[in-house]
Amino acid sequence: MNTNTNTNTNISSSGNNIINTPTTNNNNKNNNNNNNNNNNSNNSNNNSSNNNNNNNNAVGVKTGKKVNLKVETPVQNNENSYSLTTSGTFKEGDLLINKKGLLIKGESPKNSSVNDRNKNKSLHSNLNPQLLASPTSSESMDFNQGFYNNNNNNNNNNNNNNLNNFNNLMNNGIDSPQLSGISISTPTSSHSFNNTFTNYYNNNNNYNNYNNNNNSNNNNNNYNNSNNNFNNFNNYNNYGNNNNFNNFNALQSSSNSSFDISSSGSSNNYLNNSANNHPHYDTNLSYDLKDLKIIRVLGRGAGGVVKLAYHETSGTYIALKVITLDIQENIRKQIILELKTLHKTSYPYIVSFYDAFYTEGSIFIALEFMELGSLSDIMKKTSTIPEPVLGKIAFQVLQGLVYLHRKLHLIHRDIKPSNILVNNKGEAKIADFGVSGQLQHTLSKAVTWVGTVTYMSPERISGRSYSFDSEIWSLGLTILECAIGKFPYGSNLPHQQQQPLQQQQQQQQQQQQPLQQQQQQQQQQQQPLQLQLQNLDINNSNNNIRNSNNNNNNNNNNNNNNNNNNNNNVLDISNGGLVDSGSSVPEGMGFWVLLDCIVKEEVPILPSTFSKEFRSFISECLQKEPTERPTASNLLNHEFVKKYQNFNVEKWTANLKQQQ
């Protein structure tokens, strides 16, 4: 019901705001008393630009009490430690070091639209990203006033003022922005939940009022669930409680909607079925260096080191990525890119991001600890991975790719064995988003050349544009390598021919010249460093490349480039940085020969000892033409994936744990 009111607002010199309101009808009185009894409207609009709008648009609250507008800034536990998730929206920019620590320079909340902020969810690490980011929901967030308002016509008028309020709070050093108006919609229903988080910006204790207001107004928003599970969402004290998150999952499963994130008309709903696999952790905890006990080093990379750390407060282990600031510019950009990606990503088959902070001259990123390590680590112990286990891993990774491609429009661009991690439960998750890229929509193409070159698709190596289908090639090559225990190219595997005539001719040549092949293999083993290449054409450029005979096995080209390629790194032609070429270059095969082989030669296939379903899966992934590769969503319907998607890997993981 609309009610015309004229509200006069006076602000005293002491900073106290007295609101005088005229008489309104009884219905509006009840609504205002139930929802605005803590007078948060006055506390939220503490700036001169809002005073004029309050005269015309403010909701009438009949009270004669003075409200203290003093803003209290939470005390930092460690003056030298700053959380990255409270420094502003993650927009295009780079690292900036100042007296406040590590900040993100670029577009700030003041200059960004509401829709841009919606994509990044809340920026406070204490807000559970899993509850705010359901794969089956479409979120809409608005940093409005700190109270629930039944008169929705006033929200539009005060929208700009509310945004200014939020910016003023952030500029004053307040860490937790207020959040209200979370709208979750599905194809069959649309519900709005108006929730306000704890408002500690004033001296009033509004916490109990906040919960009471929400509980009294959200009774109709249960998604047809038998119990009021979503009311637990409003309980701030129990925000990290596992039961609350399970209730949220039950809320999803009780919905009658069949939301398919991949494509319309598909019968698969894998994203919803796996919601219970989210890692449960208390996001109210502070991941500060003083609370972490470093156990050991898990791995090292170009930008830093990953350590196993024990969080004493929660009694949990985390993987702590430590990056020093004395690093190359391209590594700095990768750090920001990974932080932006991790912050907006929450899915069972993506490695969870807990927090990030800057202290002691380094950036610390707290991630989910995966006990069994990467697929590369596993292959070092077991040589190969059984087919049923690979089927289960493919099922899990494909779900992660569907989420990245369809939900976030994101290309990982570096799918390989070392970037797929496994925990003790046998759950495989995608990690390392340092070179990921976002496309505007599913039909977009990328043209940059970043990632591990040996796992790139032929179109990427050739310098052509690429899209999500390039990840299918990388996944197929990864699964194939795990099955045979070595990189497929140069491993004497049979190759799939596109034309039957060429296949017959090659088979005849192999039968007629077995001795010559053996001699060539012996020569390659005896003289792996003396392979001379002439007129090798890569990316339609005529480059004369030959391998020099030295102890470092460096390849020098004739383009006056003095770059040393030690079979580990190759120049990134997109931004001048280094791109890891991987450790999968077969012994005796030059790096450029390998790339030429991937582009020009036929693709490898699985031996006949594997099942026909597995061989078909690899064959469909390793199609030279991108348009002939199935999408990640389509591959979830493949017979190989369906065959092993429910396979129990506990016995396999138990054997691996014994070998550690």
Curated annotation (Swiss-Prot):
Classification via InterPro entries: Kinase-like_dom_sf, Prot_kinase_dom, Protein_kinase_ATP_BS, Ser/Thr_kinase_AS
Reactions catalysed, as given in the entry: L-seryl-[protein] + ATP = O-phospho-L-seryl-[protein] + ADP + H(+); L-threonyl-[protein] + ATP = O-phospho-L-threonyl-[protein] + ADP + H(+); L-tyrosyl-[protein] + ATP = O-phospho-L-tyrosyl-[protein] + ADP + H(+)
Chain positions of cross-link Glycyl lysine isopeptide (Lys-Gly) (interchain with G-Cter in SUMO): K105
Consequence of gene loss (knockout): Cells are unable to undergo chemotaxis properly during aggregation in response to the chemoattractant cAMP or activate guanylyl cyclase. Form extremely small aggregates resulting in the development of slugs and terminal fruiting bodies that are significantly smaller than those of wild-type cells. Transfer of the temperature-sensitive mutants from a temperature of 18 degrees Celsius to 27 degrees Celsius causes forming aggregates to split into multiple small aggregates.
UniProt KW keywords: ATP-binding, Chemotaxis, Cytoplasm, Isopeptide bond, Kinase, Magnesium, Metal-binding, Nucleotide-binding, Nucleus, Serine/threonine-protein kinase, Transferase, Ubl conjugation
Binding annotation for ATP: L298, G299, R300, G301, A302, G303, G304, V305, V306, K321
Any matching Pfam family: Pkinase
Name of protein: Dual specificity mitogen-activated protein kinase kinase 1
Organism: Dictyostelium discoideum (Social amoeba)
Taxonomy of the source species: Eukaryota, Amoebozoa, Evosea, Eumycetozoa, Dictyostelia
Gene (name only): mekA
